[in-house]
Amino acid sequence: MKELHKTSFLESLLIQKRVIGALLMREIITRYGRNNIGFLWLFVEPLLLTLVMVLMWKFFRMHNVSALNIVAFTLTGYPMMMMWRNASNHAIGSISANTSLLYHRNVRVLDTIFARMLLEIAGATIAQVVIMFALVIIGWIDVPADIFYMLLAWLLMAMFAVGLGLVICSVAFHFEPFGKVWSTISFVMMPLSGVFFFVHNLPQQLQHYVLMIPMVHGTEMFRAGYFGDSVTTYENPWYILLCNLVLLLLGLAVVARFSKGVEPQ
């Protein structure tokens, strides 16, 4: 009897890469279709939402309230919030939408979750880059002070989005009503994520508690990279990284546990 070929770690990674790539294409076609602009909605949708927020703050003349560029302030907070919120929201339905695919030997529950979250992260990232580049060109905002620091903050928050998505998906799998209310909960969390404020402007007795929220550190770090020394920020990259690792390890462990009861044997 011919012995089955055992794949190496590198071969397994290549297989998983192809599987996730195929799931990504399936998700894009299923969600956006093949007609009209199709997959371009991947980043057009978050771009338009961000643009609406920017224009609203711009034309309501919120720049008269502060000397800070209010367009840049909005742009350095809202898209990042959309990334972790959308990634966690869409992670919830990833298993039910791809149940039939789990009968394929190389498709795992984790792959379906990763594919959806990567799609949301990619869309938010492209939207952030495109709209920031466009607004710099037309002179609405200045060139960022430290692009590398902004990139590091974005990567840390993308990592946070993945960890949060895994945990939320796991909780929703075990407690279905939670999946229905998470969208509302995440919406309520928007004001707490640092999108609409600098920690420095809060009362000192509140700052300690606000800095316990990992999303606040990501937003502060991203804005520190953009505005440079013109603003005072209180980010701690190591704290975000620690929170990310905890979420990732917890999420991976729980997903691995319930996957055994979902994937066909």
Curated annotation (Swiss-Prot):
GO BP annotations listed: lipopolysaccharide transport; polysaccharide transport
Transmembrane domains' residue ranges: 37-57, 64-84, 121-141, 147-167, 178-198, 236-256
Domain ABC transmembrane type-2: 37-258
Source species, domain of life: Bacteria
Protein name per UniProt: Capsule polysaccharide export inner-membrane protein CtrC
GO cellular component terms listed in the entry, alphabetical order: ATP-binding cassette (ABC) transporter complex
Example GO molecular function: ABC-type transporter activity
Compartments, record wording: Cell inner membrane
Task performed by this protein: May form an ATP-driven capsule polysaccharide export apparatus, in association with the CtrB and CtrD proteins.
UniProt cross-references to InterPro entries, sorted A to Z: ABC2_TM, ABC2_TM_bact-type, ABC_2_transport
Species whose genome carries this gene: Neisseria meningitidis serogroup A / serotype 4A (strain DSM 15465 / Z2491)
